[in-house]
Amino acid sequence: MSLGPWEIGIIVLLIIVLFGAKKLPDAARSIGRSMRIFKSEVKEMNKDGDTPEQQQQPQQQIAPNQIEAPQPNFEQHYQGQQVQQPQNPQTPDYRQNYEDPNRTS
């Protein structure tokens, strides 16, 4: 299904009627600006994407030679010790500083 000259003319006429002749140049300008911004962002992303790959290659060569230090086992260290519990736990009284806003006195 191809568009002939009549169909294209009708579509252009509908766009002019819907958006108005005054708004079309502004819309075209804003679309052009958006495309330029989009292209510049894509270029920056491509630049940023190239540099980390180059930096990662030397790090990958160093990584196999590194040896991790053994981690201490904390369970064995504290296994023989008893945990001391507080003798008289006090529950706080939350009502001591509370003033009822609905109370009339």
Swiss-Prot record:
* Region: Disordered, residue numbers: 41-105
Segments of skewed composition (Basic and acidic residues): 41-50, 96-105
- GO biological processes: protein transport by the Tat complex
* Topology of the protein relative to the lipid bilayer: Single-pass membrane protein
| Intracellular or extracellular location(s) | Cell membrane
Cite the Pfam families for this sequence: TatA_B_E (PF02416)
The UniProt keywords, alphabetically, are: Cell membrane, Membrane, Protein transport, Translocation, Transmembrane, Transmembrane helix, Transport
* Segments traversing the membrane: 1-21
> PANTHER family this protein is in?
SEC-INDEPENDENT PROTEIN TRANSLOCASE PROTEIN TATA
Q: What exactly does this protein do?
A: Part of the twin-arginine translocation (Tat) system that transports large folded proteins containing a characteristic twin-arginine motif in their signal peptide across membranes. TatA could form the protein-conducting channel of the Tat system.
Official protein name in the record: Sec-independent protein translocase protein TatA
Q: Which gene encodes it?
A: tatA
